UniProtKB/Swiss-Prot annotation:
<keyword id="KW-0963">Cytoplasm</keyword>
<dbReference type="Pfam" id="PF01266">
    <property type="entry name" value="DAO"/>
</dbReference>
<keyword id="KW-0489">Methyltransferase</keyword>
<dbReference type="GO" id="GO:0050660">
    <property type="term" value="F:flavin adenine dinucleotide binding"/>
</dbReference>
<dbReference type="Pfam" id="PF05430">
    <property type="entry name" value="Methyltransf_30"/>
</dbReference>
<protein>
    <recommendedName>
        <fullName>tRNA 5-methylaminomethyl-2-thiouridine biosynthesis bifunctional protein MnmC</fullName>
        <ecNumber>2.1.1.61</ecNumber>
        <ecNumber>1.5.-.-</ecNumber>
    </recommendedName>
</protein>
<comment type="function">
    <text>Catalyzes the last two steps in the biosynthesis of 5-methylaminomethyl-2-thiouridine (mnm(5)s(2)U) at the wobble position (U34) in tRNA. Catalyzes the FAD-dependent demodification of cmnm(5)s(2)U34 to nm(5)s(2)U34, followed by the transfer of a methyl group from S-adenosyl-L-methionine to nm(5)s(2)U34, to form mnm(5)s(2)U34.</text>
</comment>
<dbReference type="GO" id="GO:0004808">
    <property type="term" value="F:tRNA (5-methylaminomethyl-2-thiouridylate)(34)-methyltransferase activity"/>
</dbReference>
<comment type="similarity">
    <text>In the N-terminal section; belongs to the methyltransferase superfamily. tRNA (mnm(5)s(2)U34)-methyltransferase family.</text>
</comment>
<keyword id="KW-0560">Oxidoreductase</keyword>
<keyword id="KW-0511">Multifunctional enzyme</keyword>
<dbReference type="GO" id="GO:0032259">
    <property type="term" value="P:methylation"/>
</dbReference>
<dbReference type="InterPro" id="IPR006076">
    <property type="entry name" value="FAD-dep_OxRdtase"/>
</dbReference>
<dbReference type="GO" id="GO:0016645">
    <property type="term" value="F:oxidoreductase activity, acting on the CH-NH group of donors"/>
</dbReference>
<dbReference type="InterPro" id="IPR008471">
    <property type="entry name" value="MnmC-like_methylTransf"/>
</dbReference>
<keyword id="KW-0819">tRNA processing</keyword>
<dbReference type="InterPro" id="IPR036188">
    <property type="entry name" value="FAD/NAD-bd_sf"/>
</dbReference>
Amino acid sequence: MTRVLEPAEPILSNDGTPYSPRYDDVYHSARGGLAQAHHVFLGGNGLPEGWAGREQFVIVETGFGQGLNFLATWQAWRSDPQRCRRLHFVSIEKHPFTREGLARLHAHAGLGDLLPLSDQLQQQWPDALPGLHRLSFEDGAVTLTLALGDVETMLPKLVLGADAFYLDGFSPSRNAEMWSDTVFRGLARLARIGATLATYTAAGFVRRGLTAAGFEAHKAPGFGGKRDMTVARFAPVWKNRRHAPPEAAQWAERHAIVIGAGLAGCAVTERLAARGWRVTLLDAHDGPARQTSCHRAAAMHAHVSADDSFLSRLSRAGNLHALRAWGALEAAGYPVGWHGTGVLQIGEDDAENAAQQAALAELRFPESFVRWMSPQEATEQHGATVPRGGLWFPKGGWVAPPDICRAQLAKAGAAVDALFNCRVAAIRRIGDAWQALADDGGVLAAAPVLVLANAYEADRLTSGQFLALRRVRGQLTDLAPAQAEALGGWPDCVVTGGGYLLPRDAAGGARMGSSYEADEGPLVERPEVHAANLDRLASMLPDRASQIAQIDPATLQGYVGVRTVTYNRLPLVGRIADDAQALSRAAALRGAHLRDLPRLPGLYAALAYASRGLTWAALCAELIASQIEGEPLPLEADLADAIDPARLLLRALRHGHAQAPESAGPGVDAAG
């Protein structure tokens, strides 16, 4: 993974064409970037005719540049009455412009009717952070997925089936890595049969490389004074891929059951409804967000580590995606009540502080995402009298999770049939439909797709053998307004360290936490845990320690709940494996990859978000909806694998620890 992204500079050549001093080349012909986009890329791929009447159409681009190809394609889609239902545009860019740089170039480009589209793009434009960034337009009908990083790094990380390719890197003589055989093979891995390709270059080695990768390539009339360009079609004469790329799903009925109406389930419900699905939402409680998601206030921020671990990457991607998703809800008239106060994460000791600073130096992320904040600045700017400095996340903050759930269900509207006070006792698959059963065996709902978003209760409904869900108890502590006032001041931002504290609410009260312990005994508040939370508070605000010591833990109230976690703290998201079938073929699958494992058709998990439900729910819901529809995934392949529900099964198979079961296991009846 490319960790440090160096943004491009918005420089113009003598004739006014955007120019890159890094590659000593222009971004497009002097005769105009939009005209080039229409002739070379739209025309060269037979668009818009090629997407007519399609459910979805996927374009992959190498070299986003200033985004003129995307804007021209988006405009062509909007103008076409025969347009595809959903347009996915996936573009790889190693040196993205900043938002300000993009705005300067677009102002110079004379975009005319495209200016409103440019404004929307600029509003959602991400920071220069490595990984995938999914931007949504036209109420989700047009999706731009930016893959920020080196092309040879990012291509293998894309999970999608492409219908068309735009090859728009700088000239092969200036940027050879964009035109390598490795890249051509990477394109072929993603291409659906018959996928088209176009590029402005007519270099012979490009056509030969494409041909070797399975494309039929030939010359076509060029643009802007160039006699020729290259067009191609993917038509391999032999099987050259272990796994074919995903195809657009063909569902006879777009109806899904979602079990669980917390952050995970409501997010999945909204994402499916946005794609035209009808959703039956089942929950054992009397409304949404009644269990672990019922907090009246919870914080969200990214995780940073020098090695940019799976946890760090997933948290960064989830944090950014959640903010965009919630912004879209707000813009559509469904307020979520986000408080962007910022989050200060201090180290618990000097060693952790040093590790935080080392991570910043290694990653060199934009300060708009994370930077160092000294204790002096924390005190002066935010009233946070912390003992040491820490990581400042300016886009972090807090929100009430139930408000998120209510906004998502309101957005889903009539597409969702929510059944509360409705306990699911078992699930089974009969024919092509999953059924959710009541305690008396009656069918509560039936649909071709079922999503388990019910935390540790999922163990009851599946064999559970390789989900390995664990319950971890957590207790929060509330301070009454008078108690918070007696401390003589309170930070106006979220502070995390050995524990965490949230800004005071509208009534003047405050919240802090949280314990993290094995789930044992009755689920009731314990004074000794409130006392431990007070100790955590004193460690973060040591100058208030004497006042904090005056608070009697026995007088405190709060909230106690159970987190669902896995062995490595990463969630379980995606298609659930068919354990019985896999174990019956254990010897044959010992050297398998995740994509080789048999899956239970139509059964998905959105589980084990632990204490990061706010961070992960929106992104993981988009992942599940994309898998169901056969769309490009919003996560890199290795990240999707890292949270795959079948990962523990795969590990058992590889180590020879998997044994064939005596039965299909409790919970899932796959009869029929």
